Each structure stands twice: as structure tokens, then as C-alpha cells.
Amino acid sequence: SGEIPLLEQLGATVYRGKAGQKFVFQMNDAEKAATRALQDRNLTVAMAQEADLLVLDEAGSAWELDMVDKDLLHRAVLRRPAGQECVLTAHAAPQWMLDAADYVTEMKCIRHPYQKGIAARKGVEY
């Protein structure tokens, strides 16, 4: 999330898809539904914008965890306007998504202070 202010300074429109501060496994059903509704709404709005670049951060996880309408995400990736490139940060993304994106990055955690119970710190994790 630390990249968001810079992207906004550069004129990018950033749609954030989290309705709270919890991880999905910590959410109750109502929180999951609210987050999914927000994800779907943001993706619908993003798809309606004219843009050269569509960045789908953690879209594979959203797909796997059923936190986004799968048909909507499928359309966003496979039926995007001609000339629009798709950037995907992929953790657990389905193969079709990996094949369709123009750029795919997977960050693999080998060690992180979170594993020792250290909370996210301003200026480091966000």
C-alpha cells in the first residue's frame, strides 16, 4: 500500500478493494460480502475507464478466495480494450490469468517479521 500515494501523485486512479483492516481468514461472512461487493464495484468502475494499463494487485488471491465476481474478473482480463496492458501480481492465480496478463509478478515471502508476531510498521510495510 506504500505505493498508492506515489501512484496518485502520478495521476493514476487507484481503486482499493478492502472494506476493512482484516485478512480474509479473519473476516466474518458479512465482512467478506462487503469486501467482495467493494471489489466488484471497483473492478466494474475500472473497466469502464479509458486506461492504457490495468493493474490487478493480488487478483489471483481474490479469485481463489472467491472475493471477486469470477465472471467480472474473467472479462476484465480477457476482454480488455485493444492496446490496454494488464499487470498482475499473482499469488495462486489460475493459469488462464497468468497466460492472459502482459506482466506477471509473484513475490514469495521467505522471511517476514509478521511471522514473529510483529505488526505492520509505517514506512516499512505500508
Give residue spans per PLM region.
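Conserved P-loop
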Residues: 1-47
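Short, well-ordered alpha-helix to beta-strand connector turns
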Residues: 11, 50-51, 101
